[in-house]
């Protein structure tokens, strides 16, 4: 089964996750969310499964330049619509692998997900 990793190639955390997957021989597909934004239904699934707080990247440049109204919408309103319109706000990387859905990168978590 091929894992899917969503993010942007310039993100250090995404780079670490991609490197780890490659070094451990894990078959994976990388999706650059700026070039191929996931559909709203998929983003909604992520938000519903993991929560808005975990999906919104408050360290991103996009977040820092957003109006207070847009930030409020991202936190308590239609988070999925805001992430769809601003894919660089998606906390990254997002990992999908079978029943696994996770955001961020942790060697311990990835080791558990891909026990060989």
Segments the model singles out, each with a brief description of its role:
Residues 33-116:
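Thiol/selenol-based redox catalytic cores and closely related redox-interacting motifs
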């Amino acid at each position: 089964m091929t894992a899917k990793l969503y993010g942007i190639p310039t993100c250090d955390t995404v780079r670490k996750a991609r490197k780890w997957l490659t070094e451990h021989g894990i078959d994976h597909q990388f999706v650059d969310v700026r070039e191929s934004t996931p559909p709203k239904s998929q983003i909604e699934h992520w938000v519903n499964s993991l929560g808005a707080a975990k999906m919104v990247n408050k360290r991103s440049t996009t977040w820092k330049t957003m109006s207070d109204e847009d930030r409020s919408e991202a936190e308590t309103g239609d988070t999925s619509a805001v992430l769809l319109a601003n894919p660089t706000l998606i906390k990254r990387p997002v990992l999908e692998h079978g029943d696994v859905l996770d955001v961020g990168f942790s060697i311990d978590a990835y080791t558990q997900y891909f026990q060989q």
